[in-house]
């Protein structure tokens, strides 16, 4: 394959992608167009633009994608109550499809030969970026420098940056920072002492969540209103998707909610450890589960729960644009037609707890479930036949076992 003449680079302005920008220019002698997505990572993006200009980028795209990110990616995922391996809210995974989508679109708009990313050859992101890109354009070339160059460690990367006078960010203690990924849904931290799972993560790693021990001593109540499975208002005030998640991040972070220390199984086969901060997402998940409790019938809810692990795994592994994810999404979205109503939660020292929920679409019938007189709403004698029919199989099995086992 001939060397590319123009490459669109997913560019954060950080150490890795700044080195990649320089490397692409020198390795291929090509033009590099940078694309920086504002997904709510909380950073000022103008420095990334200026850095790209300083390093000779042929074109620079900086786009605010926060609303699209939450509306078209985060919210559909939360309709499923998706958790990878029962714990991880998929904050990094769900951002990759949107970034890949815009990379491919910009490549097509600018006539670029290839796209490039800063994911390492050991991680999941390389798979996610590339599977998404190929799903959208089967002819696109993807350049993954970490799988090509000799800079095989963060130490060598820093040495390269110093040699080429590329600025290196430092943390508040004057050290190179953890490997961090951030967006409106979460912040993840990896590397350094976190690579030893037997060592407790230091408190200074937290960037958006107060330590639960330092959170307010007074609980705070918050009400979240849903329409067809998506949050639409907080405390009665309608808000856009990104605004809702921003406000829930503020509330959850204030009360120490959403810290996860996780050792997970990467798609590429190894285990890795990360510290995940997902304040708003943790609150939103508890609220969504709360409204489903009264609006979703039992069989539908159990079916939905049974497919959730597979759905979460597809997102984690980079198959957002696959037909199987879309088929599962159609089932999930169908289940949300009546998931409309309001949930009240109590936020307190690391926990978000649903304490009340109500809806015009509720299936909860106090007349049927009451311990008091139900005025004929439920005939308890109906349970006799129900039990006998369900017991028939068990009785037949038991009779056979007694016949052949003598007991």
From Swiss-Prot:
Alphabetized Pfam families for the sequence: Arginosuc_syn_C, Arginosuc_synth
GO terms of biological process kind: argininosuccinate metabolic process; L-arginine biosynthetic process; urea cycle
SUPFAM superfamilies associated with the record: Adenine nucleotide alpha hydrolases-like (SSF52402), Argininosuccinate synthetase, C-terminal domain (SSF69864)
Binding-site residues for ATP, renumbered to this chain: 10-18, 37, 118
Family matches, as Gene3D superfamilies: Argininosuccinate synthetase, chain A, domain 2, HUPs, Single helix bin
GO CC terms, sorted: cytoplasm
Pathway assigned in UniProt: Amino-acid biosynthesis; L-arginine biosynthesis; L-arginine from L-ornithine and carbamoyl phosphate: step 2/3
Disulfide bonds: none
Residues that coordinate or bind L-aspartate: 120, 124-125
Enzymatic class: ligase
Location relative to the cell: Cytoplasm
Record key words, sorted: Amino-acid biosynthesis, Arginine biosynthesis, ATP-binding, Cytoplasm, Ligase, Nucleotide-binding
Sites where the protein binds L-citrulline: 88, 93, 124, 128, 179, 188, 264, 276
EC number: 6.3.4.5
PROSITE patterns, per database record: ARGININOSUCCIN_SYN_1, ARGININOSUCCIN_SYN_2
GO molecular function: argininosuccinate synthase activity; ATP binding
Catalytic reactions on record: L-citrulline + L-aspartate + ATP = 2-(N(omega)-L-arginino)succinate + AMP + diphosphate + H(+)
Subunit structure comment from the entry: Homotetramer.
PANTHER family: ARGININOSUCCINATE SYNTHASE
Record family assignment: Belongs to the argininosuccinate synthase family. Type 1 subfamily.
The protein's name in its UniProt record: Argininosuccinate synthase
Species name: Jannaschia sp. (strain CCS1)
Gene name for this UniProt entry: argG
